[in-house]
């Protein structure tokens, strides 16, 4: 019985990992997450300036990653985004080993 439960937990963990990878699996999202990894926290305006992307594009991708990949923290009128998941940091390190 314990073996079955262990396999079920492992399977659920793999499903969560697959969902995380699916959420990140877009070039623009990877760029955003990479910048957040480098800078620790950025607001939307800063991300727009760094990546030279339209505000609507950045906001759309941030919305898709909120919760699973990113967290937001309000500081006055600004909302700062940062990486919410240690697995995400591991993925970025794997993709950019020189940083």
UniProtKB/Swiss-Prot annotation:
Q: Which residues form the HTH arsR-type domain?
A: 9-99
The answer to whether keyword Repressor applies is yes
Keywords assigned by UniProt, alphabetized? DNA-binding, Plasmid, Repressor, Transcription, Transcription regulation
The UniProt GO MF terms for this protein read: DNA binding; DNA-binding transcription factor activity
Q: Which residues bind DNA?
A: 43-62
SMART domains referenced in this protein's UniProt entry, alphabetically:
HTH_ARSR
Which Gene3D superfamilies does this one have? Winged helix-like DNA-binding domain superfamily/Winged helix DNA-binding domain
Superkingdom of origin? Bacteria
What Pfam families does the annotation carry?
Answer: HTH_5 (PF01022)
Task: Quote the SUPFAM superfamilies the UniProt record gives.
Answer: Winged helix' DNA-binding domain
Please name the InterPro entries in this protein's record: ArsR-like_HTH, HTH_ArsR_DNA-bd_dom, Metal_resp_trans_reg, WH-like_DNA-bd_sf, WH_DNA-bd_sf
Task performed by this protein: Represses the expression of the pagA and atxA genes.
Q: What is this protein called?
A: Transcriptional repressor PagR
Q: Could you tell me which species this protein originates from?
A: Bacillus anthracis
């Amino acid at each position: 019985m314990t073996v079955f439960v262990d396999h079920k937990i492992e399977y659920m963990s793999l499903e969560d990992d697959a969902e995380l990878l699916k959420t990140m699996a877009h070039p623009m999202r990877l760029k955003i997450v990479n910048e957040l990894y480098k800078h620790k926290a950025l607001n939307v305006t800063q991300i727009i300036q760094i990546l030279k992307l339209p505000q609507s594009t950045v906001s759309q991708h941030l919305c898709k990653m909120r919760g699973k990949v990113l967290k937001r923290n309000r500081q006055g009128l600004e909302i700062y985004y940062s990486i919410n998941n240690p697995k995400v940091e591991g993925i970025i390190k794997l993709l950019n080993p020189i940083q």
